[in-house]
A protein has these predicted regions:
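Acidic anion/phosphate-binding donor-loop and adjacent secondary structure
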Residues: 101-104, 130-131, 135-157
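Conserved donor-binding/catalytic core segment of Leloir-type glycosyltransferases
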Residues: 119, 151-171, 177-181
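Short hydrophobic beta-strand element within catalytic cores of glycosyltransferases
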Residues: 250-255
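A short, well-ordered alpha-helix in the C-terminal region of glycosyltransferases
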Residues: 280, 287, 294-309, 315-321
């Protein structure tokens, strides 16, 4: 099958959204499909190889004929739907609710009302679209099971972990900082480790910080963490908590409708779900500090849950089957 991923007007850079698209494209190449990434400019992505053919669009003649073309960002939809029919059946792959790029009404008008078939990456996003009167299909990106797995036995010391991200306040990294401060004031065996795309913030409460770690460093990092804090409130399918769970970290999240964790976190089974306020969040983290048996039970269940969601290969095969239904 010939597949085009359109990143027109959005581009590729060192961020989670670009990484997901590139890993999906690479997986489809490995599955013997012809895959292209259609871009408005030069790729700024340096986190790994791009196996798909990257095309910098100059004229429409640069675009190959294809079976399907997939818009991958809110701002790529308008440009993509104007492309020739020979580019294939048009899909939109929604992987977040990007209110930092558009208002909700703009999303409805420019993305949801566009004449494309909608794919989402999570239950939360599917429910959001349904509440607005739009149908969609769930295709998750999957995970790399060979990259992150349990390596060590954890000690009684508790290491809290989280994503440090200041660009979008909806990531709520401030909740992680607040939680660590509150619990460090009560317990002596607590540390906080964080990673992110920001340079080291040099905040005293953070005991260890990794800047843009590669897969090997990230795997080791997750294995040193006991409890992963995931307070984000505006996600599609939140990836770092899944990676942490593969290393048998226990995740604490919230019941925010777009937490991005409802696909894989079931309260007290595969993680802990706090109410969507910071006091409840701190209380759930403290439960895990005080109860190592609960941590042990949930950590095993959590890893199994992420494995059950499937590998990248399994999920991209599902995507291809969906494409085949519309060709």
């Amino acid at each position: 099958m010939k597949i085009i991923f359109s990143v027109l007007n959005t581009g590729l850079g060192n961020n989670g959204g670009s990484k997901t698209i590139i890993e999906s494209a690479n997986t489809l190449v490995n599955l013997n499909h012809d895959v292209y990434i259609l871009d408005s400019g030069k790729s700024m992505y340096t986190w790994g190889p791009i196996k798909a053919q990257h095309i910098k669009l100059k004229t429409k003649r640069d675009i190959p004929d294809a079976d399907v073309i997939v818009s991958t960002g809110f701002k790529s939809v308008r440009a993509t739907v104007r492309l020739p029919k020979r580019c294939g059946v048009q899909f939109t792959y929604m992987r977040g609710w990007e209110l930092w790029k558009m208002s909700q009404q703009q999303i409805i008008n420019e993305v949801l009302k566009a004449p494309t078939i909608k794919i989402v990456n999570s239950i939360g996003l599917q429910q959001k679209l349904k509440s607005l009167g739009f149908e969609s299909y769930i295709i998750r990106p999957g995970n790399d099971f060979n990259s992150i797995y349990p390596m060590i036995s954890r000690t009684q010391n508790v290491v809290l972990g989280g994503l440090y991200h200041t660009k979008h306040k909806t990531k709520r990294h401030s909740w992680i900082i607040h939680t660590a401060k509150a619990l460090k004031s009560k317990y002596t065996n607590i540390q906080l480790w964080m990673f992110g795309s920001d340079s080291d913030p040099n905040i005293p409460v953070i005991d260890k910080y990794l800047y843009q770690p590669n897969k090997i460093k990230k795997a080791s990092f997750y294995n040193g963490i006991t409890v992963w804090l995931a307070p984000s409130e505006l996600e599609g399918l939140h990836i770092p908590p899944q990676e942490a769970m593969l290393a048998e970290c226990v995740v604490v999240t919230t019941d925010a409708p777009l937490s991005g964790t409802s696909d894989y976190i079931s309260h007290e089974k595969t993680g802990l779900v706090a109410k969507n306020d910071i006091f409840s969040f701190v209380a759930q983290v403290e439960r895990l500090i005080r109860d190592p048996l609960l941590r042990s039970k949930i950590s095993k269940n959590g890893r199994k849950m992420i494995i059950d969601l499937g590998s990248r290969e399994t999920n991209m095969q599902k995507m291809v089957k969906l494409f085949e239904e519309f060709i």
